[in-house]
A protein has these predicted regions:
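Beta-strand-rich N-terminal accessory domains
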Residues: 13-74, 78-81, 224-246, 292-302
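Acidic/His-leaning functional-site neighborhoods
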Residues: 24, 40-41, 79, 84, ...
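Extended, loop-rich substrate-binding clefts of extracytoplasmic carbohydrate-active enzymes
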Residues: 77-126
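Cleavable N-terminal signal peptides of Sec/SRP-targeted secreted and luminal proteins
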Residues: 2-16, 316-329
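Acidic (Asp/Glu-rich), glycine- and aromatic
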Residues: 135-164
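Active-site/ligand-binding surface loops and adjacent short beta/alpha elements
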Residues: 153-156, 160-243
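Short, well-ordered beta-strand segments enriched in hydrophobic/aromatic residues
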Residues: 26-28, 120-122, 129-137
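C-terminal GPI-anchoring signal of eukaryotic secretory precursors
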Residues: 304-318
Length: 330
């Protein structure tokens, strides 16, 4: 059985959309077209957006990560674009129960001089969620340049040091791009030299997640053979993350006892330390011809975790569904 409805929280002026496919339930919001909840068989899998990090699954557009000095040069003019772009902080237009669009406007053009439409859609089928991004260059004459990526955070008590990420294939040639942690204009940028990714992996497949795993920010992998990774928490695979349409996989969490891990599919990267600041020179920048579209997606397959919390969460979901239906009646 598949159905959907809208819940209006008037006191917060935020509209949420809930989609249900048998045992998998997701909630999204128009602000950032962001996921706010993923429940499978009554258990929450998405970070709550409260402790340590106030986001949950932001869209990275039209840049991924940091720009050198926080700005870039496009067609001879300097533009300031915030870390991970501006889309995650803008309100999208809802165009369907599970679809949103952000269109270029005066605010976006002041930061990014391209005309575009960014579509975000969520599809659920059985125990799998697919997140789809479609970018359309709406200009008739000019090629559009942009980067894009995802940043979902999944519940995982990695600080207990019982968690790991397993690559689907043996990774013989995988590389890691270190994040530069030296204070100054190059802070948070990609280092020019890569590291053998095998130094991070056990038996060519296992990335053990420890308390100090993210002391140097994200672990950014490139030249990945696997199409998917598994997130294992306390001896159980909780999800399978498929990102084969992207060039990089960033893995990150906040320092401390943060109860989540982010799996970040990136098409492009932050600026490198030796960046020229020219947007057109960014590594793997997407060049989209006039009136053309670029579609890219990733998917998450969820596995049932039976221990603890399920009954309460299912009752809570049933109450939420009842409230939503009552609101619709009025």
């Amino acid at each position: 059985m598949k159905f959907s409805f809208q819940v209006f929280l008037f006191f917060a002026y935020i509209k949420f959309v809930i989609l249900v496919e048998e045992d998998l339930v997701i909630t999204t919001k128009a602000l950032g077209a962001e996921l706010t909840s993923i429940k499978y068989k009554g258990r929450e899998y998405l970070h709550d957006g409260k402790s340590f990090w106030d986001k949950q699954s932001p869209i990275l557009f039209p840049t991924v990560g940091r720009l050198r000095n926080g700005k870039t040069k496009i067609n001879g003019k300097d533009y300031e674009i915030p870390m991970h772009g501006f889309a995650n902080n803008m309100t999208f237009q809802e165009i369907g129960k599970n679809s949103y669009v952000l269109k270029s406007n005066e605010e976006t053009l002041s930061q990014f001089p391209f005309q575009f439409e960014l579509y975000v859609s969520y599809l659920i089928e059985k125990n799998t969620l697919t997140v789809n991004y479609t970018v359309k260059n709406t200009n008739d004459t000019e090629t559009m340049l942009f980067g894009i990526g995802g940043h979902p955070g999944f519940k995982c008590d990695y600080y207990k040091e019982k968690s790991f990420i397993e690559f689907e294939e043996d990774e013989d040639n995988i590389k890691v791009i270190p994040v530069n942690m030296t204070n100054g204009p190059s802070y948070g940028l990609m280092s020019n030299e890569t590291i053998d990714g095998g130094e991070f992996l056990k038996n060519k497949k296992i990335l053990e997640i420890k308390k100090n795993s993210f002391e140097n920010d994200a672990i950014v992998f490139k030249d990945i053979q696997s199409k998917s990774v598994f997130l294992n928490d306390d001896g159980k695979n909780i999800l399978k993350f498929t990102f084969d349409q992207f060039n990089y996989l960033g893995i990150w969490s906040a320092q401390g006892n943060a109860p989540y891990v982010c799996l970040e599919p990136w098409y492009t990267t932050p600026d490198y330390v030796n960046s020229t600041n020219e947007f057109k020179d960014k590594k793997d920048i997407i060049k989209l011809e006039p009136n053309k579209t670029k579609e890219i997606s990733f998917s998450v397959e969820f596995f049932e975790i039976k221990n603890g919390g399920g009954i309460f969460q299912i009752k809570s979901l049933s109450l939420l569904l009842l409230i939503g239906n009552l609101i619709i009646l009025f």
